[in-house]
Structure formats: structure tokens, C-alpha cells
Amino acid sequence: MRFDHPAVPVAIAAMLIDSIGFGIVLPVLPALIVELGRVDLADATRIGGYLLAIYAVTHFFAGPVIGSLSDRYGRRRVLLISLCCFGIDYAFMAFAPSLGWLFAGRAIAGIAGATYGPANAVIADVTPPEQRGRMFGLLGAAFGGGFILGPAIGGLLGDLGPRAPFVAAAALAFANAALILAVMPETLVPENRRPFDWRRANPVGAFVPLFHTGGAAALLIGALLWQIAHMVYPSTWTFYVSIALEWDSKAIGWSLAASGLSMMLAQVFLIGPTIKRFGEDRTVLIGLTAGVIVFALYAFAQQGWQLYALIAAGAVTGLVGPSINAILSTRVDAANQGALQGGLASLSSVAAIVGPLAMTQALAFGAERGHAGGAFLLASLLCAVTFAVFLLGVVRRRAVLA
């Protein structure tokens, strides 16, 4: 494949490596928390939720700052610093003598941010507008591919102990930084840089465009509730299968890889044809209906094959987010699309704070009472509420106005 600028394949490779590094550590996180905290899996679940929340909180406040710094000092420098900080984070977790070190590492990672924002900026800097969609698609595919490979590799490395995948993730992060240092040129030319402005770096200000989306309150409420429900996967999966099915790190890794593959296939092959046939409104309702059913069935699954069947069926839930975003994008003009997407990213950050706390508490509460599926029941309930909000506040309201 031909690229218009040498920085583009480097940015895509960086996204792939970074995503692999993130996925590697997931299968062994429960075992490491149990080891350091000397707690059972139910309490480890709660601690895992706190770790995810501290990352989300620091990332929420630091994300706009990192973006503004990349506009001031360039993409390459910010990418290098971010990746080095991620390497330090994983090293903290690999050699942590206590839980406090894990929390310090997660805070560092949240402040540093991830590579996705700067990598997107690299593509926007050097790619013609008519080709950006394809390049952004490749970037998303690299992220999805890394999330398939990472957990599988992490599950295999878990046989060496719960710290081995963190060592591998740290090595990948530093190798990623070395790759950028060696071969990636700066893409933001000096004349396009702007002074750092704290007003632009205000995370609360990112929500302002959401209040100018033409009567989209029900859509925004639905988007937030859906994102909180969907956080049941990253925040509880590894703990849930450890408690409910007593899976080891290898089995956890393969299941996460299967989940990533299922979602990626849905993004590539399912969303476009479904929206074309049914329209955005009905596509959202189809995805939410699948969420209500699949999440509820997860709560009562007792065999591994049942979980894999639900992973395949759960790909339909991937219809919800893109369809809601497509509807929202029609509520603002072209000049405000970027601001809208920034506001939606901030909404996702709120879900990333609230979701893990709610889901891990629900799982732990149920596990202590003999039923580990509490988090999935909560997710199913949230999907049902989102369905009602969307049906009454969007679909029927549009029919009345028509």
C-alpha cells in the first residue's frame, strides 16, 4: 500500500504496537491484584474498577492539555513522551511491590494520554482530505488488530507469571518510542503551530457543543447510558470469567481476542449494510435489543461455549455507537463537526469514569452472594432504559414533528 507521507505508516504501526501492549496485560490483571492486595477475587474486582477509574479521571483532565501541547510543540515530541510514560507505567506495574504502585502507574498513564489522538493528528496534518477517511479507517483497524493479538499473547505469557505480560508491554512501549525517534519526521510545520492556551485545554469546555445539537437531549442521554453499559466488558470481563468459570490467563486471553475479532468484523461488515437497509434509528434499536438479551444471558452462562456463542451474538451491539454518532452528526453544521466529536469524546470519558465503578461494584456485590453475573444484569437494565429513552425521545418525537 502506498502512503503519501512517511509518517503515516509509522503512526499506524505505533497504534498497532500500543494496542498490543494494552491488551497484553488484561488477562493477568486479576492475578496481580490478588497477589499484591492479598484479597479474594471479589475485592480484586473492586480494586480493578478503581484502577480503571483513576486512569479515566486523569485522562479526562489531561487529554485536552496533551492535545494543545501537540499543537504547540508538534506531534512527534508528544508521541515520544506519551509512549515513554506508558513504558514507565507498565514497568511500575511489572515490578510493583504494593497496590499503591499500581495506582501511581495508572495515574501516570492517564496523564500521558494515549497515542490515538496524536496519531489522528499526524494523519490530518499530512493526508489530503479526500483520503483521510481511508487512513483513519486503517488507524482504527490497527487498534482493533492489536486488541486481538494483545490478549492472546498476554494469555500465553501469563504462564510465566502475572508480571511477565507487563514486562513485555513496557518493552513494546519503549520500542514504539524508539521507532518514532528513529524514522518518524515531524508533521506539524512551525507556521501551523499555535501558542498553548489554558482556555482551549479546559476539559469542561468540550461539553459546550453538545448543548447546540438541535434538541438532541434524548440522544445524548442514550449515548451516555449505552457507553456506561458497554463498559461492562473492559471493566469486569477478566474478573467475571475468573470467578464464574475459574478460567486461567490463557483462556481469558483467547476470549478477549475472540471478542475483539467479533467487534472488528461487525465494524467492517455489519454496520454499513444494516444502516442502509433499516436506517440509523432502527439500527440503534436493533443493537440495543441485542444488548438487553445478550447481557442478560451472560449473567447466567455456565459453560465456556455459551460465552463464545454470546461473544459472536454480541457483535450486533456494535451497531449502537456508530449509529448514534451518525444521527448526532446531522444535528450540527459542517463547521461544528469537530467540536461535536470532541464533546462526544468527553462524554465517553465520563462513561469511562462512572462505568467501571458501577460495573465492578455490581460484580463484586453479586459474587459475594453466589452470583457473579450482577454486572451484566446491570448492563442489560441500562440497555433497556436506553431503548426506552431512544424510542420515546427520538423515534416517536421525530414522527410527531414530521
Name what the model sees in each region.
Residues 177-183, 377-402:
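Multi-pass alpha-helical transporter architecture, strongest
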Residues 281-324:
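C-terminal transmembrane helical hairpin of 12-TM major facilitator-type secondary transporters
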Residues 1-4, 185-222:
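Juxtamembrane intracellular "pre-TM" segments in multi-pass secondary transporters
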Residues 105-144:
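Cytoplasmic helix-loop-helix junction between adjacent transmembrane helices
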